[in-house]
């Protein structure tokens, strides 16, 4: 019974991962704001097509005053990943002097860039077929103290 539950959980986890066009690891960063630091995230293309991904920061709700947007430098901001490929993205977090032990948070957003829009609409016998694609966007938290 336990084996069946483990297999089901493993199967569901893999289905969710494969449904996304790309995956990001790690899914959370905890940074030390007393000093500067460089961190790495890895992007994996789960599709048979090349992907273009844009990376930027966003302020989460409740952290309008205590965010790290001005302290984070991302490079590269736009990347291309071959089918089944893996790329590394780095970001530098500049330390905050006179930190009053507040918790700071910023979202690092990975957004798939729009591909060339190719509309494929076929009309046959008053039926319409249309291709639809989704744009994947993943946000991970960067926490600092």
Predicted regions located by residue number:
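Terminal connector regions
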Residues: 96-145
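Short, solvent-exposed loop/turn segments enriched in Ser/Thr/Gly
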Residues: 34-40, 87-88, 101-107
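Beta-sheet-dominated interaction scaffolds and their linkers
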Residues: 19-46, 76-78
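Short acidic, flexible loop segments centered on an aromatic residue
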Residues: 47-66, 110
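Sec-dependent N-terminal signal peptides
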Residues: 4-14
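Intrinsically disordered, low-complexity Pro/Gly/Ser/Thr-rich segments with frequent PxxP/GP/PP motifs
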Residues: 67-97
């Amino acid at each position: 019974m336990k084996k069946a539950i483990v297999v089901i959980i493993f199967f569901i986890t893999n289905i969710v991962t494969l449904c996304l066009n790309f995956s990001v690891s790690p899914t959370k960063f905890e940074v030390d704001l007393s000093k500067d630091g460089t961190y790495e995230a890895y992007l994996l293309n789960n599709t048979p097509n090349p992907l273009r991904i844009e990376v930027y920061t966003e302020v989460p709700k409740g952290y309008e005053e205590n965010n790290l947007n001005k302290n984070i430098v991302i490079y590269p901001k736009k990347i291309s990943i071959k089918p089944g490929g893996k790329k590394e993205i780095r970001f530098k977090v500049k330390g905050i002097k006179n930190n009053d032990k507040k918790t700071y948070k910023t979202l690092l957003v990975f957004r798939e860039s729009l591909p060339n829009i190719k509309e494929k609409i076929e009309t046959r016998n008053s039926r319409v077929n249309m291709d639809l694609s989704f744009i994947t966007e993943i946000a991970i938290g960067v926490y600092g103290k």
